[in-house]
């Protein structure tokens, strides 16, 4: 995939995550703040947990930084897969954000 295609795909992913986080605040009373600067999305939860999702265009990866560690995801045409064999991006973010929110939340991509 070209860099332009990758950046467009990442933009859609970050928009979707941000929109879902806003929905959690409205429908599940999750205390969360979102901020976006270019291809960096930061989620801040009531307990002070920060989750940062950003793109690395040169590697064509999405990186996630959370209390539990740093994770890298590469797109295979259908899914964002952990480069170390862990859960796919939506599953990992669902778990990370659920722990920070104190209630189950789901990320769907």
UniProtKB/Swiss-Prot annotation:
The UniProt keyword set, sorted, is:
Iron, Metal-binding
Name under which the protein is recorded: Iron-sulfur cluster assembly protein CyaY
Primary role:
Involved in iron-sulfur (Fe-S) cluster assembly. May act as a regulator of Fe-S biogenesis.
The cross-references to InterPro entries, in alphabetical order and at most eight, read: CyaY, Frataxin/CyaY, Frataxin/CyaY_sf, Frataxin_CS
GO CC, sorted alphabetically, is: cytosol
Q: Which domain of life is it from?
A: Bacteria
Concerning Pfam families, the annotation shows:
Frataxin_Cyay
Q: Which NCBIfam families match?
A: FeS_CyaY
Look up keyword Metal-binding and say if it applies. yes
Q: Which GO terms describe its biological process?
A: iron-sulfur cluster assembly
A Gene Ontology molecular-function term?
A: ferric iron binding
What PROSITE patterns is this protein classified in? FRATAXIN_1, FRATAXIN_2
Q: Which family does it belong to?
A: Belongs to the frataxin family.
What gene is behind this protein? Answer: cyaY
Q: Which residues form the signal peptide?
A: none
HAMAP family hit by this protein: CyaY
Source organism per entry reads Bordetella petrii (strain ATCC BAA-461 / DSM 12804 / CCUG 43448)
State the coiled-coil residue ranges. none
The answer on whether this UniProt entry bears the keyword S-adenosyl-L-methionine reads no
